[in-house]
């Protein structure tokens, strides 16, 4: 199912998902450094593999996907299938509601 068919996202639930599943490797804080994964501030509208100062896999650079709701929704289902060769070890979020909630949170927190 695509993002067009996704349930409405709840950013408060998304924040909990981010803290438990993403914050170990990512931050959303403007000006903060990279962790294991790149800083996600300014994520929407950015091309994969282009954040300054982060060492991306060739796969992420070559994919050249523009991050927006639709691409994140598909990516977060199964990152390794969406970008074969990505360094991200996260297995993905299988529930459509979890993906919608996380995207709602990221949209607010990374702007």
Swiss-Prot record:
Lineage of the species this protein comes from: Eukaryota, Viridiplantae, Streptophyta, Embryophyta, Tracheophyta
Major subcellular location class: mitochondrion
Keywords: Acetylation, Electron transport, Heme, Iron, Metal-binding, Methylation, Mitochondrion, Respiratory chain, Transport
Gene3D superfamilies listed in its UniProt record: Cytochrome c-like domain (1.10.760.10)
UniProt modified residues of type N-acetylalanine: 1
One Gene Ontology term of the molecular function aspect: metal ion binding
Positions of heme c binding: 22, 25-26, 88
Summary of the function given for this chain in its UniProt record: Electron carrier protein. The oxidized form of the cytochrome c heme group can accept an electron from the heme group of the cytochrome c1 subunit of cytochrome reductase. Cytochrome c then transfers this electron to the cytochrome oxidase complex, the final protein carrier in the mitochondrial electron-transport chain.
Protein name: Cytochrome c
Annotated Pfam families: Cytochrom_C
Post-translational modification: Binds 1 heme c group covalently per subunit.
Residues annotated with N6,N6,N6-trimethyllysine modification: 80, 94
Superkingdom assignment: Eukaryota
Family statement: Belongs to the cytochrome c family.
InterPro entries linked to this entry: Cyt_c-like_dom, Cyt_c-like_dom_sf, Cyt_c_1A/1B
GO cellular component term, pick one: mitochondrial intermembrane space
Subcellular location: Mitochondrion intermembrane space
